[in-house]
């Protein structure tokens, strides 16, 4: 078939007919060093593959979601072709196989000879176990896609003519679109680009090496070129010297002097123009870094030449020397989960209201009381901390703030009683329960013996102010006995530590009798008295029983005499 086409073209050329026109793409997109183009028109898989090969490319491979997005862009701007089917570079060799055992491509291969992919979008998800037999080819279409932005893949007979095809081209380097200085003159400038794969237009994100640019009305014809091994190309022309300074800085490596009708490139001090009239040669005494805004990398293969580089978050400006900020927030996908704020050389991520930024992700705030172990109730303070609160009449325990204890700051408070029986009641420390289920403050000062100084009764406790004659003069605590305050270690030979005047901390009461202890002592004493009385009663009963037994034994002989059998004599009857 290919031989017939070649012979036909030669025959037409020999007869003087013009050669077939080069196919014009209906749309194209370039991503870094790869370009993709849509060519409308009926063609079999073989015809489409030959045309792409003739343009130094191949039918498109769709190995990732990025390539699928490119197809969506091309289909949206193709004027209706997207509603039909387009060949891509995926085919099934002759033979049959089980698609379930052949990976995501079901045994199909790319025209590049491999089956590497991280993406697939088959129209028929389940083949019901039916084997696939080649040869088959794949076309994409958005007509029956459930998601318009994700065209589906359909198996087709390779001899069937599709409505068009997609080609893919790879280039070692690309150029950015021409930079035009803003102003009144810029509005009149019109640029038309042409690519090696016959795409023409004014809206390109990147142009591969070999692309041309026609600048009207200046009459400029520029070409995207790059030295061997370079990945970033630049715009140039065969004629030496600068062109209009408003377009790409006149092509000058350093500065462009906009002399009317005769623009000229200038180099920094110590450097000279090269033969092309646009490049500069650095002097041996000049530092390379003086020529670039951020970093300068000398080219060891070409003495005097260099390349400028920028820090992360910046890119080279059109003059290839200055650095301009990259707006990271316009990238797709966005670097932030919700809101992105661009900064000089970077960006900041922010979250919507009621969300928190945690490890680069926006998450709903977690209730700080979720894992709290509060005995009664938890009160959030902020997004990370909380406070345990207690019921009325209770307060947190200082050393265990998640637990509660009874609290009373008056001379009398209601007791905490069992609501079922009312037989079990508790009072705070320093209070005693009366008959009316009321906790009454124990007046330690009235009882005496607790303070040798001036005693002030307080709710639940007391305060002892030591007199001037005391070893702890002016000390405020619960005792003025230095031995008790010092813990009883009066014979250690060490002087007692000086108390802090005016201390508000109440030390542990040494010798203070707790109300519960008083009740316990009373109950124990009563039990002891009852036990003694019981013991006396038992001894008296035992002594009485022994005496009765002895009396019984002593009286036994007389009782036996009395109880012996009495013999009676028979008395004769008188007549």
From Swiss-Prot:
Pfam entry (one): EGF_Tme5
InterPro entries, sorted: C-type_lectin-like, C-type_lectin-like/link_sf, cEGF, CTDL_fold, EGF-like_Ca-bd_dom, EGF-like_dom, EGF-type_Asp/Asn_hydroxyl_site, EGF_Ca-bd_CS
Keyword match NADP: no
UniProt keyword terms in alphabetical order: Blood coagulation, Disease variant, Disulfide bond, EGF-like domain, Glycoprotein, Hemolytic uremic syndrome, Hemostasis, Hydroxylation, Membrane, Proteoglycan, Receptor, Repeat, Signal, Thrombophilia, Transmembrane, Transmembrane helix
GO molecular function, a single term: signaling receptor activity
Residue(s) carrying (3R)-3-hydroxyasparagine: 342
Disulfide bonds: 137-158, 245-256, 252-265, 267-280, 288-296, 292-308, 310-323, 329-340, 336-349, 351-362, 369-378, 374-388, 390-404, 408-413, 417-425, 427-439, 445-455, 451-464, 466-480
Disordered: annotated span: 484-506
Record topology, Extracellular segments: 19-515
Effect of residue 486 to Y: In THPH12 and AHUS6; cells transfected with the mutant are less effective in converting C3b to iC3b on the cell surface after complement activation
Glycan attachment sites: 47, 115-116, 382, 409, 490, 492
UniProt cross-references to SUPFAM superfamilies, sorted A to Z: C-type lectin-like, EGF/Laminin, Growth factor receptor domain
Chain spans, region Involved in alpha-L/beta-2 and alpha-M/beta-2 integrin binding: 481-515
Ranges annotated as spanning the membrane: 516-539
Membrane-topology descriptor: Single-pass type I membrane protein
Mutagenesis / variant outcome for changing residue 501 to L: In AHUS6; cells transfected with the mutant are less effective in converting C3b to iC3b on the cell surface after complement activation
Ranges facing Cytoplasmic side: 540-575
A single cellular component GO annotation: vacuolar membrane
Segments forming a coiled coil: none
Post-translational modification: N-glycosylated. The iron and 2-oxoglutarate dependent 3-hydroxylation of aspartate and asparagine is (R) stereospecific within EGF domains.
Subcellular location field: Membrane
Result when mutating residue 43 to T: In AHUS6; cells transfected with the mutant are less effective in converting C3b to iC3b on the cell surface after complement activation
PANTHER family: SKELETOR-RELATED, THROMBOMODULIN
Record remark: domains: Extracellular region (481-515) contains a binding side for alpha-L/beta-2 and alpha-M/beta-2 integrin.
Protein name according to UniProt: Thrombomodulin
Organism: Homo sapiens
């Amino acid at each position: 078939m290919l031989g017939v086409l070649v012979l036909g073209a030669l025959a037409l050329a020999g007869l003087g007919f013009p050669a077939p026109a080069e196919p014009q793409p209906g749309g194209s997109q370039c991503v870094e060093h790869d370009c993709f183009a849509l060519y409308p028109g009926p063609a079999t898989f073989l015809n489409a593959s030959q045309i792409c090969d003739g343009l130094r490319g191949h039918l498109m491979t769709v190995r990732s979601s990025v390539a699928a997005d490119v197809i969506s862009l091309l289909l949206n701007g193709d004027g209706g072709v997207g509603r039909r089917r387009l060949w891509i570079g995926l085919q099934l060799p002759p033979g049959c196989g089980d698609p379930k055992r052949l990976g995501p491509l079901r045994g199909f291969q790319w025209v590049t000879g491999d089956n590497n992919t991280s993406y697939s979008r088959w129209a028929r998800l389940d083949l019901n176990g039916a084997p696939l037999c080649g040869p088959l080819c794949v076309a994409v279409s958005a007509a029956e896609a459930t998601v318009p932005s994700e065209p589906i893949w359909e198996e087709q007979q390779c001899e069937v003519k599709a409505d068009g095809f997609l080609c893919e081209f790879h280039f070692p380097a690309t150029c950015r679109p021409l930079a035009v200085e803003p102003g009144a003159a810029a509005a009149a400038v019109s640029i038309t680009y042409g690519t090696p794969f016959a795409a023409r237009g004014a809206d390109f994100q990147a142009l591969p090496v070999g692309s041309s640019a026609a600048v009207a009305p200046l009459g400029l014809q520029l070409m995207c070129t790059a030295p061997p091994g370079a990945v970033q190309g630049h715009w140039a022309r065969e004629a030496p010297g600068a062109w209009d300074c408003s377009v790409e800085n006149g092509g000058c490596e350093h500065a462009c002097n906009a002399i009317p009708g005769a623009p000229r490139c200038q180099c920094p001090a110590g450097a000279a123009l090269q033969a092309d009239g646009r490049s500069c040669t650095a002097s041996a005494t000049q530092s390379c870094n003086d020529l670039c805004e951020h970093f300068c990398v000398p080219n060891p293969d070409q003495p005097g030449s260099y390349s400028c580089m920028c820090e992360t978050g910046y890119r080279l400006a059109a003059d290839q020397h200055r650095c301009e900020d990259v707006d990271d927030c316009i990238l797709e996908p966005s670097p932030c989960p919700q809101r992105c704020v661009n900064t000089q050389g970077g960006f900041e991520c922010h979250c919507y209201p009621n969300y928190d930024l945690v490890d680069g992700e926006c998450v709903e705030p977690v209730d700080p009381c979720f894992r709290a172990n509060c005995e009664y109730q938890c009160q959030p303070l902020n997004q990370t901390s909380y406070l345990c609160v207690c019921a009325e009449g209770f307060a947190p325990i200082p050393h265990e703030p998640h637990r509660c204890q009874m609290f009373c700051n008056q001379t009398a408070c209601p007791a905490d009683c069992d609501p079922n029986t009312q037989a079990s009641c508790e009072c705070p420390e320093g209070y005693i329960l009366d008959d009316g289920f009321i906790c009454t403050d124990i007046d330690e000062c009235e009882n005496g013996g607790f303070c040798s100084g001036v005693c002030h009764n307080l709710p639940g406790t007391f305060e002892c102010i030591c007199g001037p004659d005391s070893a702890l003069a002016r000390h405020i605590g619960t005792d003025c006995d230095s031995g008790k305050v010092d813990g009883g270690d009066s014979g250690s030979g060490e002087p007692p530590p000086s108390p802090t005047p005016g201390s508000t901390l109440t030390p542990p009461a040494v010798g203070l009798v707790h109300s519960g202890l008083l009740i316990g002592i009373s109950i124990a004493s009563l039990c002891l008295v009852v036990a003694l009385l019981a013991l006396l009663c038992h001894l008296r009963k035992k002594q009485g029983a022994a005496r009765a037994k002895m009396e019984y034994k002593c009286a036994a002989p007389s009782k036996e005499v009395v109880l012996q059998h009495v013999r009676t004599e028979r008395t004769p009857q008188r007549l």
